[in-house]
Amino acid sequence: MDIVTAAGGTDPEPVPVEASFDEFVTSGGADLRRALTARYGVEVGVEVTADVFAYAWEQWARVSAMANPIGYLFRVGQSAARRYRRQPVVLPIAHAPGEPDFDPRLPHLLERLSDRQRVAVVMVCIYDWTYPKTAQVLGVSESTVRTHVRRGLQTLRHGLGDAE
């Protein structure tokens, strides 16, 4: 159904706000959750993700018009995380059946990386995100992501005794 505008033209019927928000959460929500969980750990990351989606819903008219809403909401998540008690990031050690085994020192070594290095390494090497996608979500340049990944992997290799 088309809507007749005041100028006499027709516009397609607008997409309901709920539908566009649901589509956004479905398409980008997992990426945002993964980025926030990689940054803040499972417990805080999940809580912050919920806070961010609540904020996005309240501000949907403004957020939906942004060129990079995921990147913006990641920054909102950084601010929201400040409300949570400062705790060291605890990465889960258990992994799903069928996943490759990993060195049990790895979670501890990941915790020792800088926040930016850890997020970049997890997004690129564990979640298999591209450098451009990671850069977009984090709101940094692709070369910054490459640098963080390179330095993070170098630190991990050194810690595991596999220095190149």
Which residues does each predicted region cover?
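Arg/Lys-rich amphipathic alpha helix in sigma70-family domain 2
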Residues: E58-A65, R75-A94
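Short, charged helix-capping/linker segments at alpha-helix termini
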Residues: E13-E23, R33-D51, A61-A67, E164
